[in-house]
Amino acid sequence: MGKSRTKRFKRPQFSPTGDCQAEAAAAANGTGGEEDDGPAAELLEKLQHPSAEVRECACAGLARLVQQRPALPGLARRDAVRRLGPLLLDPSLAVRETAAGALRNLSACGGFEVCDDMVTKDIMTPLVALLKECSAGLDSNEMSLQEKKDQNRNSIENIANETVNVLWNICECSSRAVSIFNKEGCLEIVLKYLSRFPTNVDLAISVAYCLQTVTEDNPELLKSFSATALNMLESALLSPVSSMESLLLKTLVAGTIWNLKDIIPCKSQAEIINALLKILSEVLGMDAGEMVIQMKEAETQRLKTAAEAEEILENTNGDDLIEDDEMEGISHKRRVRRKTFVSDLLPPTDKELRETIALLTAQQTALEIIVNMCCNEDPSDDEWEELSSSDESDAFMENSFSECGGQLFSPLCLSHEVHTALTNYLIPKKIFEKTAFPNSIAVDLCSRNPTWKPLIRKMNTIQCRALFCLQSLVSLLDVEHLGGAAALQTLAQHLSQLLFSQPDFAKHVDFLEAISSALRALLQTMASKNISQCMTPDQLMTLCKAGIHSSNVGVRVNVVSILGITGSVLAKEDGTLETLKNIGCFLLEVTTKDPSLVVAGEALDALFDVFADGKEAERASIQIKLLSALKEFQPVFKMKIRKEGRGNYSTDQLCVLDNVKMNLRRFIAYQETVEKRLTS
């Protein structure tokens, strides 16, 4: 009950291999439970070594080690953050980059607690200092772009990229880090990095991720955005698309600009929103499945051509290389030296795979931005701070409920500008297309290649995001803008086919939550407009019986709500007595047995809807002994709210539960009159 924020997902993080194979292998074989912390102790000790190359390899080994969750407690015990922090300002640029890579992985793999601990251990001081040094270095660096490209080793831009990723991860998990970001003037620095998007899109993408994080719910930072800063974002937003990575950059910048909507002048709002949704429409209009197929074929052909060329070269020059010992020695030395550079420690990523991942990530991000556009701000905790889950709050709740005409929270709404742009750019149609299962040929290609296999999960995630988007749009747009009643019935059939085409749908929790959310919104809209529903009661009961056993609270809330919507429609029809009895018994069982108050409250709401009116509903309520069951449960529900509510549920959830408690009292009184009338 209540809106939940869309989740954000990080990109795959830095994972070193290469010249530091010994350290990496030791890290991979180590366990966090050893008394001496295994490889952790040795690697941390090497961070103090006089040799820069040893320090670099130790950092790379730690970057690999922190990806193993059992190793994290040992690293925390040995104060890894305080030991790595100073290396961000090491005299060696190579050490700086690998130290930042290790901290990047630590912040990504450790989660909220580790990131908060990193802030406590003052990682932000050397991190901000390194950001500023990189900025100054970029200003003073007069090498030509071609020289920089050829050098491609331990460059300032590479260090800046790793540093921004650490900053992004920490700010995503720690409000204290965001506060430091604000106070230390980091915005100006990262915007300078963003300005390099024409020549370094990787750095610009990292900055855009970071900006999208720090601009969310951060009014203090919004004051720091000057006209120059906004112009920089605009130039990145409107830049030509030269690759899928540049398209991802534009999408992330669009998300940042949406976060800044409160400081955009009113006269420019429509133009800006139009520009944002034009880009999101372009991203969603691309066929990701076809892209996967084309890029995989291109990679196969490129590797085949390269292998043939290498074989010809070996056949031509093999004898000369064997005979020329001196040249062989030089060649060997070069190969060994080349492996010590940090860029060789990064996992090799083929250009086709990078392009494909960029498109999939852009589409996922675009869908998440649209969901955010469709959501009201979360209710403030302060708004309900004085409410308590006690009987004394009932009078206040009843007055508030009456004043709002029976609606506790304001409904979701779209601004005219967003509404117009969504429909003009055919966003609903494109989102509908994304709800289909991923291209089977693309999935098959990816499943047969280890480096491409993770893309299957990304394609499935896009489908789930599209279903959540569909939920928002169905709730917000007029039926006419969704294509009319016939289109909604077609959509219901489509969702039904998606759901029941998978016999084991209950095992796919993310998919089940997304599709049940979309179905809930769709059935609610159809019921409110008296549009006949296409799913049979038996199909809905199959969904609900599977969903109610899910560990995901959102799934359980959705299925009981779906039953409530369906039951309220059936209650007005003749010949539905047995179905209503089944629905009532199911909802009563959920009400009394589900461990979550949120689910129990939703089930009570559903009971109120189903048995509020109609002759068949009245007969069913008597036969399942609804009144006595609710009377018995009422004191239990009050007690559970009082004992379990505080600390386990948010203030807006508690407010809704108080509302359900009040309605339960009303509903029992109503059922008493029904029972008297029918039994007298």
Swiss-Prot record:
GO BP annotations listed: erythrocyte maturation; protein import into nucleus; ribosomal large subunit biogenesis
Residues with the Phosphothreonine modification: T340
GO molecular function, one term: unfolded protein binding
Ranges of compositional bias, category Low complexity: 18-29
Alphabetized UniProt keyword annotations: Diamond-Blackfan anemia, Disease variant, Erythrocyte maturation, Phosphoprotein, Repeat, Ribosome biogenesis
Chain positions of HEAT repeats: 38-69, 74-110
Phosphoserine: residues bearing it: S15, S144
Physiological role: Plays a role in ribosome biogenesis and in nuclear import of the 60S ribosomal protein L5/large ribosomal subunit protein uL18 (RPL5). Required for proper erythrocyte maturation.
Protein name per its UniProtKB record: HEAT repeat-containing protein 3
Species of origin: Homo sapiens (Human)
Gene: HEATR3
